[in-house]
């Protein structure tokens, strides 16, 4: 079952999986070039790796039958009306904790849960598939394809990753109490992953219209205009506290 088309060819204006992966990683990297000072190095690497991995599950033949039916038909595989396991679930159980920690010297064990949860739930899907069903599905429709896509032999999935998830989107899994720092890490990864994913899926290259942070033309223009004028008390106060976070209550017309 040839999966090369996922990397090298286009069909019906669909971007290939490899192209989408490269585009979203580039989008993330461009964002961090502009706004990287607001994030730690670990946070940036967690987001970029999540962008790289989150759509691996799309290599499964049921998904490919939807976006590229001609290629699946050419392979000789019959996918019929089989129910598709969400690709985010497959992506999240394709990487082991050991493999995850090898991605960066900055990654540690407590990063793994937020990371795989962000990938697993990067789309909101009902979470009703347990390990045995996922493994059976993968044997039929995914292991061979993801092995070829990644260029390495993947014999099984790490369905025990479901035990590392911060939550499950179903009615029968007990809700756990999550430490705020762990939950915030998950929100950061998932939020930026979705931001960059939606950006490139909409056909854009950059996720933010970059403000004039370098030359600060608007700021300089305002300062030039005010240079010959006497600042009002509120304006003077704001100028003197420009490096602080402020909440100011002032009447209309204060400047």
PLM features per residue range, with description:
Residues 1-216:
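Accessory nucleic-acid engagement/destabilization modules that flank
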Residues 17-21, 224-244:
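N-terminal pre-P-loop "Q-motif" helix
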Residues 168-169, 221-226, 250:
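Short linear motifs at secondary-structure transitions and domain/linker junctions
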Residues 214-219, 242-245:
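A short mid-domain helix/strand-loop element embedded in enzyme catalytic domains
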Residues 242-255:
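Walker A/P-loop
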